[in-house]
From Swiss-Prot:
GO process terms (BP): cell differentiation; protein refolding; response to heat; spermatogenesis
Protein name as catalogued: DnaJ-like protein 60
InterPro entries listed in its UniProt record: DnaJ_C4, DnaJ_domain, J_dom_sf
Annotated region (Disordered), positions in chain: 95-119
Topology versus the membrane: Single-pass membrane protein
Tissues in which the protein is found: Highly expressed in testis and ejaculatory bulb.
Function per UniProt: May play an important function during spermatogenesis and/or in the male genital tract.
GO cellular component term, pick one: membrane
Lineage: Eukaryota, Metazoa, Ecdysozoa, Arthropoda, Hexapoda
Keywords: Chaperone, Developmental protein, Differentiation, Membrane, Spermatogenesis, Transmembrane, Transmembrane helix
Organism encoding this protein: Drosophila melanogaster
Stretches assigned to the J domain: 26-93
Keyword Membrane among record annotations: yes
Main location: membrane
Length: 217
């Protein structure tokens, strides 16, 4: 029996190790800024790049590549200039594929490494979003500050209620003292001049009352 052995056709085996697709740029890379840059830095970067790639510039009018680049710059600016859209975009950067879904021929791929998890934070973070002088604080520091504010608020409320109660009681004591003084004066006049004199004075005051005078007319 004859046994045919076909040679390996190595010429038809292509190695795609050098044909990896180019990784798309992030908005930060398009504007050439840091991930923790401030809103002002985003605006300044957009202004500078617009001067270079804006379609109204004569040198860019006949260059489709520069026009397409300006579209990328505008999209990056619209996303990063608004805090809410920027936070959503930063969250989307947490998960990114490290390579194409297609496994190149001749390249060993570990299924467990199909995706590269890249946390979107710096191990040594600087100021939050580039705000100068504002440092990041830990959760326990925030909790301590909130507890201190709560204690100060409770103390202020207790002091306010206590002061209000003391003031109200002081006013009541003054009114009571004035009433007692008037009552004592009336009793003293009654003892000094007698009841008949008190009645005559009361009738005299009533006769001088404007209400009684208008009624008499």
């Amino acid at each position: 029996m004859l046994r045919l052995c076909l040679p390996t056709r190595a010429g038809y085996v292509r190695n795609f190790s050098n044909d990896k697709p180019r990784k798309p740029e992030t908005h930060y890379e398009v504007l050439n800024i840091r991930n923790d840059c401030s809103t002002r830095e985003v605006r300044n970067a957009f202004v500078q790049l617009s001067k270079l790639y804006h379609p109204d510039v004569k040198s860019n009018a006949a260059c489709p590549e520069r026009t397409a680049r300006f579209v990328q710059i505008s999209e990056a600016y619209k996303t990063l200039i608004k805090p809410e859209r920027r936070r959503d975009y930063d969250d989307s950067l947490l998960w990114q594929p490290s390579r194409s879904d297609r496994s190149p021929v001749g390249e060993t791929v570990n299924p467990g490494q199909a995706w590269d998890v890249r946390p979107n934070y710096d191990p040594n973070p600087g100021p939050y979003y580039g705000i100068r002088g504002l440092k990041r604080v830990s959760n326990w520091q925030v909790a301590v500050v909130l507890m201190a504010l709560g204690f100060v608020g409770a103390l202020f409320g207790f002091t306010s209620v206590r002061s209000s109660f003391k003031l109200s009681r002081q006013i009541q004591d003054e009114i009571s003292a004035e009433a007692n003084s008037h009552h004592a004066a009336v009793v003293a006049d009654a003892q000094k001049y007698g009841n008949e004199e008190q009645v005559r004075r009361m009738v005299d005051r009533m006769s001088r009352s404007p209400f009684n005078q208008s009624s008499a007319k």
